[in-house]
């Protein structure tokens, strides 16, 4: 681990000097190196250093930037799409430890082109790399860690672009801020002092009362005149008595009803088709009791237990 950290720091320092050879004409990206987990080798844990590669601008003497022709295109093996601007990473031939020959996995990073001074034409990067059975088209990617090349012939290994594992988006819990209720500042009511004006008491001027002498007039007694009482004669009106007219009473002749029965009353015989008197009385009494019960319950509204 210490060796890999030391090589990473040394590569960062060498990137600043070898920015022209590292395909800066495609645009100087600012990428952060994060190692993806591998299947066979243990994952890289870059907890101490987070390196950001910054490309230095090219010198003012260069008028045109050369296109990215760093490696010759090899024969593609079962490739369907042509990847734009993916510069192959040159891995250093390992001499002592086999741990340094790890294939660098390039993640898709969007790079913004930087505008440089005195540049007339900028040619696009046309260096396709060979990928084995890949159908995804990746944008222009820059290598994360570049090691200084030695005098030995460099063996260019094809970069195996692994599918980018999308990390699950961790939704942060929404922290609801407590609503701070501002205390209502009650302004003190300023009671103005009531200015009582001094009542100016005017001096009462007491006028001297002039007492007039009372003159006593002599009382003159008038003689009382008695009027004679006149008695009116009472006139008696003659009472007129009206003659009483007696109306003659007309007596209607009584016609006997055609019944066929004898006269009503006790001891009479019933007519033909009528029931006996005893049974008729019982039926009529029962009908009267039912009518009384219906009147008391339905009309008067008495409950059933009072009936």
UniProtKB/Swiss-Prot annotation:
Keyword Secreted (UniProt): yes
Compartments (UniProt record): Secreted
Free-text description of this protein's post-translational modifications in UniProt: O-glycosylated by Pgnat9 in salivary glands.
Keywords recorded for this protein, A-Z: Glycoprotein, Repeat, Secreted, Signal
Expressing tissues: Specifically expressed in the salivary gland.
Top-level taxon of origin: Eukaryota
Ranges where the record places region Disordered: 56-257
Record-level GO cellular component terms: extracellular region
GO biological process, one term: puparial adhesion
Protein name: Salivary glue protein Sgs-3
Gene from which this protein is expressed: Sgs3
